[in-house]
Amino acid sequence: MIRRCKAEEFDEIYEVINDAAARYEGLIPPDCWKEPYMSRQELRHEIDDGVVFWGYYEEDKLMGVMGIQPVQDVTLIRHAYVRTAKQNQGIAKKLLSRLRKESTRPILIGTWAAAVWAIRFYEKHGFKLVSPEEKDRLLRKYWSIPERQISTSVVLAEERWFEESPHSL
C-alpha cells in the first residue's frame, strides 16, 4: 500500500533513509559521507522545508519512502529510499508512479553522480539527464545544498520539463 507518511512515522522514515543510504559509503566523496547519512535534525529540516514523504507499506511496516516538494514552478522528487532487504522488488517504481500523479508541474530529480543505479532507474522511467551547465543552474535555483554537493551531483528531468520551455540537454 502507498500512502502519505504520518508525522508519528518520523523514526521509521529516518530508519529507511539511513538503511538504504549506507550504499553511498565509499561511493560518494568521503567529505560528503557521514554517519548517519541523514540526521534526525536534517530530516526535520527537510520536512519543515516542505518535503512531503510518501511511503510504501507491507503489513503496516514502512519499506520505502519518496519525498515530493513543490518549489517555484517545478516539483522535486527528494530522498527516495527503499530498505536494503526490499530493494529491486518494484517498490521505488510504485512510489515514483504514485508521486508523478501528485504533480501538475514538471518533475526534477537530483542525485549523486556516483549513484549510477539511481540514474539508470530514473532513465528507465523516462527521465533524462540535463547538461552539466543546466544541472548547476537548477541545483542552485531549486535545491538548498552545499557547493560541494552541486559539483558531485546530477539532475534528471521528465520529458514535460524539456517540452514546456526551452532548456538545454
List each language-model region with its residue ranges.
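Conserved beta-strand in the GNAT
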Residues: 55, 61-69, 76-81
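A short helix-loop-beta-strand connector motif used in the catalytic cores of GNAT acetyltransferases and
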Residues: 41-54, 149-152
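Conserved GNAT-fold acetyl-CoA-binding loop/helix
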Residues: 18-43
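Conserved active-site alpha-helix within GNAT-family acetyltransferase domains
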Residues: 93, 114-149
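A short beta-loop-alpha structural element at the N-terminal edge
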Residues: 1-15
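A short, internal acetyl-CoA/4′-phosphopantetheine-binding micro-motif in the GNAT/acyltransferase core
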Residues: 80-87, 111-113
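Conserved GNAT acetyl-CoA-binding A-motif
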Residues: 101-114
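Conserved acetyl-CoA-binding loop-helix of GNAT-fold acetyltransferases
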Residues: 82, 88-101, 124
